[in-house]
Amino acid sequence: MRRKITFLLTFLVAVLSIALVGGKVYADTGYEVEDYANQDFCYVNQDTGYEAVIVDDAFLLSVSEKSMLLEKMKLITTYGNVMFNSISYNSTSTESYIKSLYREKYGSESGTIFVIDMDNRNIWIHSNGAINRTINKAYAETITDNVYTYASDADYYICAMKVYEQEYTLLQGRKIAQPMKYISNALLAVVIAV
C-alpha cells in the first residue's frame, strides 16, 4: 500500500512539474511561448485607409519584434496595404499560397505581402495594384535575394525589417542594392565577349 501511495505521489509531482515548468520553444529562437502574443498586430492609416498587418502563425517573432516591425510597415501604408505572414504548414507552393492570401485579404487593392513559409523553407513577396508598378516581380526577387541570408540564419525579424526598408526605399523613388543583377550582367558580358 505504501508503494502505491509513493508511486502516485511521485507521478503527481512529475505531472505537475511538467505542466508548471514546461514551455515550448518555437523556431529555434530561444523565446518561450509567453513571449509571443496569439494576436495579430494591425494598424490602419487614417489618411489612406490602407492597413499594416502582422500574422505570425509560425511564432517566429517576439512581441517586441512585432511592435518594431509594425513601425517599419506603417510607412508603406501611404502607398498601399502591407502584410507580414509566417506559416508553419503549407499544402501548396509558397507562390500559390501568397497569391491566394492576397486575393482573399485585399482583392485588387494596392498592397504587398511578405511571407516566410517554414514548411517549404521559402520567403516570398507578392505585390498588386499601384505598389506592383514599383515593387514588381523582378524587384521582389531582388529583395528576397538581398535578405535570404537572414532567414537562413533564423534572424526572422531582421529579414522582415530589411524587406520593408527596401520596399519603402523603392516606393520613395530611390534605388536599392542589386548585387545579383550586376554579377549576372558581368558574367553575361564576359560570355558574350568570348
What are these regions (language model features)?
Residues 2-194:
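A structural boundary signal for the start of the first folded domain, especially the loop/turn
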